[in-house]
Amino acid sequence: MIIIKNGALVTPQGLRRADLAMDGDKIVRIAAAIEPAEGDTVEDAAGCWVFPGFIDGHTHMQCWTGMDWTADSFETGTRAAACGGTTTIVDYATADRGVTMPDALAEWHRRADGTCTANYAFHMALAEWNERNRADLSAMREAGVSSFKTYFAYDHLRLDDAETLEVLEELKYIGGILCVHCENGTLVNELQKRVFEQGIHGPEGHALSRPDVCEAEAVSRLLYLAHLAGDAPVNVVHLSTKLGLEAIRAAKARGQKNIYVETCPQYLMLDDTCYLEQGEDGFAGAKYVMSPPLRHAGDRAALREALVAGEIDTIATDHCSFNLHGQKDRGRDDFRAIPNGGPGVEHRPVAIATSFEGQLGPEDLCRLMSENPARVFGMYPRKGCLAEGADADVCVWDPKARWTIRATTQHQAVDYTPLEGFEAHGRAKAVFVNGVLAVRDGEPTGAQPGRYVPR
């Protein structure tokens, strides 16, 4: 057995001084004191918080986005995730138009199986709605996929409102949840054209062409459609605006149920002034080209306040990494050609812990980045809590560690980090995935114990 001793276990009820024993891939005992037997391994967690492994419910690894392949494979991405304390990702498999969901799922398994340090589950994104996809929803549930995604943006992915309504109705019937990218795509297309024709070609044009109204309108539309479908469960992903937040508040005030809200560190910590960053070649602002874009400082403040108040359920990353040099720089003369996305899977826990120091305690960090993702996506209580019989995914966290985030020392396979120079408070001292030590002091051990997580 592996026994974690002298730590403070993070539970919904608060910190609990106790020891924890893992045998194989399960937590087998939690007690005030567990004495090791001959052959047991002891992990001293004195001065540390012991979390259930963090869960990132929104990643895009080894993925073609319509412009390019993301920089991180499942191998590099899950290794980076584990180095930060994340023991499970939920990645977006995508059934492009003309591709069936079973074929898409098989392809994502081919990319991920046997290569992962952290565990992985899959959402299934639908780029079209037809009778074959309707019939295959149940097959996806049987294959362990209980969450799906549709888009209101991107011409090659977007469903119309009637199709979205039908997806919501079907998922409510089979017990699934729909995650939705909420931007008004036709409006974005028009505004991109207008901004470019005004002579704005640099990264700042990205944010100008995707204003807060594009998100808020789509959030409101989604919630009305979900209500029409009998309050079908929906997850509003990567919420970035105050207006979008107000649309969610309005729906909840009407009494609508089954609304879940996700945001990301970038929308809680950065703002749209980043697009003016020049760097050595005058193009550093492209690092922050992601969709939705970084917003005004007022949006950031509103989301931070809502997070602390408990109005946001989960913090994910939307990790979708592209190199600045060789990928993003192909849009040097046209912001519309910059691949959308950025890295974040490695630094999410420490970024949130540090940025909200004094506002969010360890119980809150656990709720937002472990327990709630497990609940929303059908993994709780197997994951998302420290309990006898739960999976042995555990992060021993040293809150006293101090270090600086640098692209040169990160494990994400990308040539920059949006958090360059960030003074981080805390670090994953030891990370166990399925009972195997995967990370020691923020560095990988080389083990690849990650498994597929059917839900």
Predicted regions mapped to residue ranges:
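Histidine-rich, glycine-flanked metal-binding segment
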Residues: 1-3, 8-52
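C-terminal cap of metal-dependent C-N hydrolases
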Residues: 7, 329-334, 340, 388-454
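Divalent metal-coordination and catalytic microenvironments
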Residues: 7, 20, 25, 47, ...
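Metal-associated gating/positioning segment near the N- to mid-region
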Residues: 45-115, 132
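Short, surface-exposed connector motifs at secondary-structure boundaries
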Residues: 86-90, 116-121, 145-147, 225-234, ...
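Alpha-helix-loop-beta-strand connector modules within alpha/beta enzyme cores
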Residues: 102-118, 166-180
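Histidine/acidic residue-rich metal-binding segments in metalloenzymes
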Residues: 132-152, 156-315
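His/Asp/Glu-enriched, well-ordered alpha-helical/loop segment
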Residues: 201-231, 282, 286-288, 308-309, ...
